[in-house]
Amino acid sequence: MKEPNATHEKAQSFFEGLWKRGDPWELETSEFEQAKYADEISILAGRRYGRALEIGCGIGSFTRLLTGPCDSILALDISPTAIARAHERGLHAVEFREQNIMHFDLERERPWDLIVLNETIYYLGWLYSFFDVAWLATQLFDATATSGRLLMANTCGGLTNYLLRPPIIRTYHDLFVNVAYQTTAERTFRGVKNGVEIEALISVFSKLPA
């Protein structure tokens, strides 16, 4: 990984700047975001998850909902401000930790029954090389328990941000398939936020028994 310290500092500075302004994505107040979260939780229905790892938890907006199907959660975010605010929720069986996933020891803390990448992967692709993201995907697969799952949700339509273009989001999706995850469920969530029609691709990948 090239210049890990410089990249980490860039990432932390970027997200700190956003979270210090409040709720930059309106995760707590947007009807669109709340409906998308509910759709993500519903796609996980039908089983419980013993240990869950949430990557890029922010202020814990989605973490709160994960406490329903999950027995214990480790929620990571690179922003100290976000983690401090997440702690204020006082969620049971949740550990919020300031951590860059690219520096996290997945080998030491595995296995995970559920891994969550909620609107996170394209930021990693912006900050790091595709090789680095591919290596992370491989490590996540290895750290997933047999029959465990990975939930990935990404905005992929309706906005002009080049990070969110459907072909780019599909490339990340295919990356996780190529490291041996199997697509268990997938759907497109559609809604309107601030007058803009937006689509989000919600995917559940599974690590099937060998």
Map each language-model feature to its residues.
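A short SAM/SAH-binding and catalytic strip from SAM-dependent methyltransferases
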Residues: 114-130
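Class I (Rossmann-like) S-adenosyl-L-methionine-dependent methyltransferase catalytic domain
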Residues: 1-108, 127-141, 148-210
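A short acidic, Gly/Pro-enriched loop at the edge of an enzyme's catalytic core
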Residues: 107-115
